[in-house]
């Protein structure tokens, strides 16, 4: 209900519709992220951790192939898959880069209207789909991921225009990577304001008590 162009169904990855870019299969929660970013045609948009490209194709569609979308993936193998997906999708306004966020920030100081940081995370939300992920999880892993995510977010802030929009998302439930990272952002970048997100069925408020008690965290999803 929260993604006008999203439909439930079974998609064969080898089907003609998928191979030619008419459809792209992804989780409803992943599609929701693109709706929150809500890029507009003609804007400058950065997808900082973009591979394999599902959310990126959504951003391309919402921008109607107008403006500039920089899709970055630090790992070359992932960047190749990202480029293939964007080509299949018919993206004309996208540029694929394979840089660290720290290097990319030097090229685009305060340049983008909107930035999506779909951060690499501990992946707790994927355990139901990929049980093998449990094998590399440990009690220390969420904090390790959170430290890495903060470095990525710091770079993102250096590339965001004044008055721009930053969307931070993960596929984990760990407070260290979610509420606590948002609280870290608000503390270290006092000009940021946490904008309320309209919630749909199955979504819950952020939990201030899982971070520093900042009441604004209820605006997160």
Task: Locate predicted features.
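S-adenosylmethionine
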Residues: 1-221
